[in-house]
Amino acid sequence: MFAALAFAFPQQLKSSRALPLLNRWQQAGPRVSVSIDSFLAVAPEHAYDDLIDEAASVHRVDPALIRSVMASESAFDPWAVSRAGAQGLMQLMPDIAVAFGVENPFDPRQNIMAGAQLLRELLDQHHGNLVLALASYNAGAGIVAQYGEIPTIRETQDYVKRVTGLLADAHATP
């Protein structure tokens, strides 16, 4: 398995995120629902396009925004877990996942649908203000409400810049 992936994706395997992902796949064994052939056929950033499009349609959220959040949050790793405990592709905190009815935060469909629903709610809460919605997604709505603007938390400020940059790039690409 590793030989096939190393041959097919030599540059990607140099990234710090690739090897832990491959190790988790190897350890998961038969629980992994993706085959090597399907992995090799679809780049990770496009593996979830159908789910992203579905979530975007259901929750009226720009699919490029969902993809940008997912890229920033998990680098398209469905098994990602942050130091704070956020889980899955859209890095849902456990309490948020429960509130949105997510039974398995590592299930791509459940995670993407809940993440898109959360984005929609935050956009509505902030009257369409993308910057405040993203700050709330990262730091929590309560903290953003306290500040009344992007909090002076470096991680949140960097997050908003990163996601809006990815979104701008996505809209600039034909």
For each predicted feature, which ranges?
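Catalytic glycan-binding domains that act on GlcNAc-containing polysaccharides
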Residues: 19-174
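Generic N-terminal initiation segments characterized by hydrophobic and/or small/turn-forming residues
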Residues: 2, 18-19
